[in-house]
UniProtKB/Swiss-Prot annotation:
Taxonomic lineage from the root: Eukaryota, Metazoa, Chordata, Craniata, Vertebrata
Region (Linker 1): 113-126
Protein name: Plasticin
Region called Coil 1B, residue ranges: 127-222
Region (Coil 1A): 71-112
Ranges of compositional bias, category Basic and acidic residues: 424-453
Species the sequence originates in: Carassius auratus (Goldfish)
């Protein structure tokens, strides 16, 4: 690194040292002093003007002391200026390095934004489209679910009605079974009564046969007795010859009338009993036939009700199975849609976090750039203040009536650069407010110079 070099050039006319413009290369940058824009008379630091020295009254000892003091002051100022230049060069080098990094990061950020802006927009658009599609499907599923719930309620009502009918039919069946049991009992009673009547008929027939036999035996006995009486009468007639024929004839007629009457009474009693038993048997047979017919009708009704109950049970089981399958299907689809929504929300949250991170990095870079710009402006103001403070005196020869000095100003190649202050406010990864403010360095320098004047 080269330092600033002051060359003393003595003019042939005035014999005074003139400081030529100084340039130095600091960290790859050139800092050159501009052409002096004004001349400053060398006077004492007090506000009173310096006395003019004539050639005849020059005190060379005092001039030499003044020159030594001046050169000592200048050497100290040169050392301080050299140190300041070294520090400024290091700061400039650091600023240049940071600006290179800043420009590189800004370029990378721009490339990243160019690369990911479209993709982020497409991802957001795809996410929004998919979310709309999922919401539409959820609405359709909600409508289907409501419809299925209505159908389920209707089926539940139908099942309740069928259960009610089933209970009623089961009650009727139980009543029919009870009636059938009673009818079976009546049939058994009728069968027992019929058997009892048949036994009675048999006993009566046996009794009739016995009575017939007894009647026949009595008739035979009567006939035998009549014959014996006739024989006796004949014997008596033959012996006494009384008129017994009429008496026998009367006795025979009486016995015949008694036998005929007994026969008729027995036949009438038998016929009446037989008719009663026949009517009772017919009534029992009719009741048994009706009981069998009612039993068959009830059996057919029970079979039909059992078939209806079985079909209703199968229909109910099929509907319940279909309802469970649909509920499982809807639950699985809802879980899938919920997983998809969660995944999309995670992706959106990750994208927002990544965007927030990039915005924070960009804001940090802007803050670093602003701090560096402020630091550079501060050093520039310090240098300008140092330049304004330093007054370069020019020694006059004894023939000169006064001292004149030139003041050189350093000019920076970056004096015309503008400072861009960009403020970005973010909230939850989204840009809320963004503002940009431009400020020229020349304006700052001019305002500072006007304040000095």
């Amino acid at each position: 690194m080269s330092h600033s070099t002051f060359s003393h050039l003595f003019s042939p006319h005035f014999g005074a040292p003139v400081y030529s413009p100084v340039s130095s290369r600091i960290g790859g940058r050139y800092v050159s002093s501009s052409v002096p824009t004004r001349s400053v008379d060398f006077r004492s630091r007090s506000s009173a003007p310096a006395p003019r020295l004539s050639y005849d009254k020059v005190d060379f000892s005092s001039a030499e002391a003044i020159n030594q003091e001046f050169f000592a002051t200048r050497s100290n100022e040169k050392r301080e200026l050299q140190e300041l230049n070294d520090r400024f060069a290091s700061f400039i080098e650091k600023v240049r390095h940071l600006e290179q990094q800043n420009s590189k990061l800004i370029l990378e950020l721009g490339q990243y934004k160019d690369q990911h802006q479209g993709s982020t927009g497409r991802i957001n658009e795809l996410c929004q489209q998919e979310m709309r599609e999922l919401r539409r499907q959820l609405e359709l599923m909600a409508k289907d679910r409501d419809q299925m719930q209505v159908e389920r309620d209707n089926l539940a009502e139908d099942v309740a009605l069928l259960n009610q009918r089933l209970n009623e039919e089961m009650g009727k069946r139980q009543e029919a079974e009870n009636n059938l049991t009673l009818f079976r009992k009546d049939v058994d009673d009728a069968t027992l009564a019929r058997l009892e009547l048949e036994r009675k008929i048999e006993s009566l027939m046996d009794e009739i046969e016995f009575l017939k036999k007894m009647h026949d035996e009595e008739i035979q006995d009567v006939q035998v007795s009549v014959q014996s009486q006739q024989m006796k009468m004949e014997v008596m007639e033959t012996s006494s010859r009384p008129d017994l024929t009429g008496a026998l004839r009367d006795i025979r007629a009486q016995y015949e009338s008694i036998a005929t009457k007994n026969m008729q009474e027995s036949e009438e009693w038998y016929k009446s009993k037989f008719a009663d038993l026949t009517d009772s048997a017919k009534r029992n047979a009719e009741a048994m036939r009706q009981g069998k017919q009612e039993n068959n009708d009830l059996r057919r009704q029970i079979q039909a009700q059992n078939c209806d109950i079985d079909s209703l049970k199968r229909t109910n089981e099929a509907l319940l199975r279909q309802m469970r399958e649909m509920e499982e299907q809807f639950a699985a689809e809802a879980r899938n849609y919920q997983d998809t929504v969660s995944r999309l929300e995670d992706e959106i949250r990750n994208l927002k976090e990544e965007m927030s991170r990039h915005l924070r990095e960009y804001q940090d870079l802007l803050n670093v750039k602003m701090a560096l710009d402020i630091e550079i402006a501060t050093y520039r103001k310090l240098l300008e203040g140092e330049e304004n403070r330093i007054v370069v005196p020019i020694m006059k020869m004894p023939s000169m009536s006064g001292y004149s000095g030139d003041y050189g100003q350093f000019s920076d190649t970056r004096a015309g650069q503008k400072v861009v202050i960009k403020t970005v406010e973010t909230r939850d990864g989204e840009v809320v407010k963004e503002s940009t403010k431009e400020k020229g360095r020349d304006e700052k320098k001019d305002s500072h110079g006007q304040g000095k004047d």
